[in-house]
């Protein structure tokens, strides 16, 4: 024999909703309005859940928080829960914070292009150059990179000799002398350029 099953269904009157009809339209918060025939409030952009009493979860926006933010997360400070607009971190721009761009407080300055392998520092706007280059855009080759430093103390005045080479085969012999240690050195340079 078939077993009878009983179901209990509660039907709420208009403008009453929720578990056991315990909520009414006057309970909607943050400007939420009662939806006809639905058991929840119609929430304004940026609010969610039955009474519109919670903000959208991170990464969601719009009415009922049903839309997903499209901001590039690592370049973004905030995605607006109301309209999904992106507030970019310093050093980024674009409607999704997807482009390199402005840097500094409030994005006041434009980044100069870095050359010769330099990387733009998004916080300062300066180029972090490779060891062989210098200046704002890493365009000036550092001519002197020390490869050997020989210190000889044969007699006074002290003499320092450096054999120096650079990226472009500029060879230099430098002799520096000083009457006393730790005083300003007087230096003479001679160059031999080979290609």
From Swiss-Prot:
<dbReference type="InterPro" id="IPR042635">
    <property type="entry name" value="MEGF10/SREC1/2-like"/>
</dbReference>
<protein>
    <recommendedName>
        <fullName>Putative EGF-like and EMI domain-containing protein 1</fullName>
    </recommendedName>
</protein>
<dbReference type="GO" id="GO:0005044">
    <property type="term" value="F:scavenger receptor activity"/>
</dbReference>
<feature type="domain" description="EGF-like">
    <location>
        <begin position="86"/>
        <end position="97"/>
    </location>
</feature>
<keyword id="KW-0245">EGF-like domain</keyword>
